[in-house]
């Protein structure tokens, strides 16, 4: 090549370098202008609401999302309550015309997007967009297993038998097979695993109901749609197992949006690891007995094989519970237990070996009759996978992974998982180019949103923080009682109940009490009932665990003259706008439990890096949880209320300033008299 041609090549490359950003800028401008016009006072979105007015924070976020889509970049957005983040990401995605995947943490938001928000926007924008909703297998009715359940006639209780009859009637008319269509059917109902499939027991194309399969239809519709709504669990389950239909979808997706992104890392950690639990053994035993009696009666002692699995499951739970079982301690939730303490106990290795042997016997029996029915091939695969897991848990974990044991009233589960999702997300970001958008109302308490971006592997993503348009200074008060008992004081929970009763009495209910532990929840709820009874107040106390979450919330909405006491699941995802909720009390600062095995492993990693684990982890986690809990109070621009944090460390410790800074800018009150005066003003305004 000559010198002249070298110069010509250099000129051409220079021109290309200049042209690419110009072309990208033009694309940016085109989509950004369309988005801006959509949000204009005379734009299509105004047709959705007679009182519509543009919101600057919403427009700011929508423009950032439009840029990320045009440039196929990663964007992380923390958008305060009231910004309207859902429309801020959906409008640019729809107007871009690109294939979009939207993922949520909860099925409730997933349903809201698919059933309400997206149809409204599509109508307003007049865009013929095909939508699809894709959930995990357990959300759909399996026709094959429903028929099996009727034939076997074995149910955990009478209620399950009645539920099956109702499901059979519904099966005749449902198009989607989504259990969410069945009002009153709790997603934790014991009938659901009986009439839904799992990756392990699905027969695939060998199933006689394959053509009518609801899971297959949902995945087919997702492959044909321009916008698909999934959830985080489904997304990560697919990265791990490649069994949910998302893997086939992702390569063709050009925009991936994750709402409720603050739950993304924990969802990923659950699914990127491995688990072996007593419930898996019991489920296998139930299916084994049903299939054995249906297709190979007399060929093997199916009842004996099931009994062996049940014994192994029972022994596994007992050895995992250890002294908790002998002490007769009643479990109300799930306990996370350290691996080394339990694995080093006498009998643990023997229990794992018993699981291995029971599964080996099942595998031998099933292989002998595997040609009798397609179900036996799946049973063999399940038995082999569980047997291999029992072998793996008997040796050291993979480098960089952490192990623990989940113990519940119903069973035990051995878990091995990575410490975060950074490696998995980096692999996705390095795949086919696409825009990645991650958003939530709470993603960090610093400018880089490092609480979220570090464990998610998004340190290089563009970061945007959009504040709430609400006037918190005028509409909300923050009360941190000075001189209050410390959380370590035995009388702390009782003092929380006493203060909550006085404040709730001023409002005649309309109060949430959020606790950090189930023990405090019980103490506070009991204390409130006692105080209200003594005073002759007709204020109801609604307690988490007394009924399903959505039932309790509906009772609170129907009767605001009540106090709802809830723990972890009530700190977020609860929306009570208006004057039905005007006071939120938090019992103490929500630091993560230091003895949690996952917390311990993360702390060790930070310390090995020479970092301050208390500042970089514990305070950061507490700030996020505190912000989530406080977010229950003000849900609309006209809401007013009082936030109370019953922890003197919030006012007295140096880190208290950082935690207060993580909250919306509420006006502080100095003492209970001022707090009561504010509540009296709110009560008077209701009339």
What does each model-found stretch correspond to?
Residues 193-228, 239-247, 361-484, 491-498, ...:
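A contiguous, basic/glycine-rich beta-loop/short-helix subdomain that forms a polymer-engagement track
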Residues 481-491, 544-650:
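Conserved RecA-like P-loop NTPase helicase motor core
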Residues 25-77:
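Conserved pre-motif I regulatory segment
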Residues 66-67, 86-99, 116-120:
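Walker A/P-loop NTP-binding motif
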Residues 100-106, 438-439, 509-516, 520, ...:
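Conserved RecA-like ASCE P-loop NTPase motor core of nucleic-acid helicases/translocases
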Residues 2-48, 98-226, 233, 288, ...:
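A substrate-engagement module of RecA-like helicase motors
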Residues 95, 111, 116-119, 199-200, ...:
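Signature of the SF2 helicase/ATPase Hel1-core->accessory helical subdomain module
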Residues 516-545:
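Conserved helicase motor "Helicase C" RecA-like lobe of SF1/SF2 P-loop NTPases
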């Amino acid at each position: 090549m000559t010198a002249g041609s070298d110069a010509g090549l250099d000129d051409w490359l220079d021109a290309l370098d200049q042209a690419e950003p110009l072309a990208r800028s033009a694309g940016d401008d085109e989509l950004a202008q369309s988005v801006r016009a959509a949000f204009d006072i005379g734009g299509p979105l105004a047709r959705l609401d007679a009182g519509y007015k543009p919101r600057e924070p919403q427009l700011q976020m929508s423009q950032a999302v439009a840029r990320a889509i045009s440039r196929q970049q990663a964007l992380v957005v923390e958008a305060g309550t009231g910004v309207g983040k859902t429309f801020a990401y959906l409008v640019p995605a729809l107007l871009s015309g690109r294939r979009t995947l939207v993922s949520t943490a909860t099925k409730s938001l997933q349903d809201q997007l698919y059933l309400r928000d997206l149809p409204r926007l599509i109508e307003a924008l007049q865009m013929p967009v095909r939508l699809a909703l894709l959930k995990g297998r357990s959300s759909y009715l399996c026709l094959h297993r429903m028929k099996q359940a009727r034939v076997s006639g074995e149910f955990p209780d009478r209620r399950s038998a009645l539920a099956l009859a109702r499901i059979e009637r519904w099966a005749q008319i449902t198009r989607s097979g989504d259990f969410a269509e069945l009002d009153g059917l709790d997603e934790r109902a014991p009938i659901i695993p009986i009439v839904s499939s799992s990756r392990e027991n699905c027969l695939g194309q060998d199933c006689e109901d394959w053509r009518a399969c609801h899971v297959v239809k949902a995945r087919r519709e997702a492959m044909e749609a321009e916008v698909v709504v999934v959830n985080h669990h489904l997304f990560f389950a697919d990265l791990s197992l490649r069994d949910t239909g998302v893997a086939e979808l992702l390569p063709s997706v050009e925009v991936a949006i994750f709402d409720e992104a603050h739950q993304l890392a924990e969802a990923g950690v659950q699914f990127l690891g491995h688990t072996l639990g007593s419930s898996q053994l019991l489920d296998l035993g139930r299916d084994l007995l049903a299939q054995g009696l249906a297709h190979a009666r007399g060929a093997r002692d199916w009842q004996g094989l099931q009994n062996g699995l049940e014994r192994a499951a029972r022994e596994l739970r007992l050895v995992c519970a250890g002294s908790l079982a002998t002490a007769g301690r009643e479990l109300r939730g799930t306990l996370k237990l350290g691996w080394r303490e339990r694995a080093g106990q006498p009998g643990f290795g023997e229990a794992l070996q018993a699981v291995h042997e029971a599964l080996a016997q099942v595998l031998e029996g099933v292989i002998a009759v595997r040609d009798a029915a397609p179900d036996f091939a799946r049973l063999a695969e399940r038995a082999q996978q569980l047997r291999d897991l029992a072998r793996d848990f008997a040796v050291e974990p993979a480098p960089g992974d952490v192990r623990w044991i989940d113990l519940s009233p119903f069973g035990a589960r051995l878990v091995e998982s990575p410490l975060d999702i950074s490696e998995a997300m980096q692999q996705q970001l390095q795949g086919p180019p696409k825009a990645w958008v991650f958003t939530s109302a709470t993603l960090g308490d610093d400018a880089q949103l490092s609480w979220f971006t570090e464990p998610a592997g998004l340190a290089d993503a563009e970061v945007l923080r959009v504040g709430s348009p609400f006037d918190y200074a005028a509409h909300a008060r923050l009360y941190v009682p000075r001189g209050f008992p410390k959380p370590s004081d035995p009388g702390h929970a009782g003092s929380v109940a006493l203060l909550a009763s006085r404040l709730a009495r001023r409002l005649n209910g309309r109060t949430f009490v959020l606790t950090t532990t189930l023990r405090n929840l019980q103490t506070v709820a009991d204390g409130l009932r006692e105080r209200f009874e003594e005073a002759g107040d007709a204020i109801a106390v609604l307690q988490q665990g007394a009924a399903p979450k959505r039932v309790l919330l509906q009772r609170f909405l129907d009767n605001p003259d009540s106090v709802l006491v809830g723990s972890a699941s009530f700190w977020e995802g609860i929306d009570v706008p208006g004057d039905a909720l005007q006071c939120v009390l938090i019992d103490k600062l929500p630091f993560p439990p230091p003895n949690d095995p996952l917390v311990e492993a993360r702390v060790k990693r930070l310390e090995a890096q020479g970092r301050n684990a208390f500042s970089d982890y514990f305070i950061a986690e507490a700030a996020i949880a505190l912000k989530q809990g406080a977010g229950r109070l003000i849900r609309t621009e006209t809401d007013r209320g009082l936030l109370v944090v019953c922890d003197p460390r919030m006012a007295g410790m140096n880190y208290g300033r950082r935690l207060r800074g993580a909250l919306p800018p509420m006006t502080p009150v100095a003492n209970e008299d001022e707090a009561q005066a504010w509540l009296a003003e709110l009560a008077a305004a209701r009339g």
